[in-house]
Amino acid sequence: MHFLVVYILIHFHAYRGMAALPLFSTLPKITSCCDSYVVINSSTSVSSLISTCLDGEILFQNEGQKFCRPLTDNRTIVYTMQDQVQKPLSVTWMDFNLVISDYGRDVINNLTKSAMLARKNGPRYLQMENGPRYLQMETRISDLFRHECYQDNYYVLDKKLQMFYPTTHSNELLFYPSEATLPSPWQEPPFSSPWPEPTFPSRWYWLLLNYTNY
């Protein structure tokens, strides 16, 4: 069931032209994940210039918190709806059209297909052997995102990654947080994609648990 939800969540949010999500399919694709975006928190004085996210530019949302890119410039804004008395019921999601390249979406699609086949065709003790586990999928997506940043402009990678990670513990994460081992301007970054042995419950598990509750 969880693998099915993974497939539905990623498949519907990762491709353009899906009839079920016409709004997301019209969003422009970020061609570089290392552009010089600026993270603006709602508590800063700068954010008072922008009172809300434009619906067509939302990159990520989780209940009252949204990550959005305004149409007026290339800044990425972390906007928290603090003025609302009651938070709207919403599902945690991220539009992969905006954060993952075509190659990355192909890899994610292959991972979910192999997981679905293992779930459908193999006995339970083989399902975990043949199909990727949640943490492996999460790690793979994180590595793809990290690698694409490195290919473009590695020295702003850490700042760019931080944009996608809410700092509050109440938010489920689709990627690993930035780590001290990430490249810096004075350090040549070797790239590797190790898949650590998964531990449970993973962030994917809590994300799916939250998703299926709606």
UniProtKB/Swiss-Prot annotation:
It is found in: Virion membrane; Host endoplasmic reticulum-Golgi intermediate compartment. Residues 1-19 form the signal peptide. Keywords: Glycoprotein, Host-virus interaction, Late protein, Membrane, Signal, Viral attachment to host cell, Viral attachment to host entry receptor, Virion, Virus entry into host cell. Glycans are attached at residues 41, 74, 110, 210. One of its GO terms (cellular component) is membrane. GO terms for biological process: entry receptor-mediated virion attachment to host cell; symbiont entry into host cell. Glycosylated by host. Transmembrane segments: none annotated. The keyword Glycoprotein applies. The keyword Membrane applies. Interacts with isoform gQ1. The heterodimer gQ1-gQ2 associates with the glycoprotein complex gH-gL to form a tetrameric complex. The gH/gL/gQ1/gQ2 complex binds to human receptor CD46. Plays a role in virus entry by participating in host receptor binding at the cell surface. This is Glycoprotein Q2. It comes from Human herpesvirus 6A (strain Uganda-1102) (HHV-6 variant A).
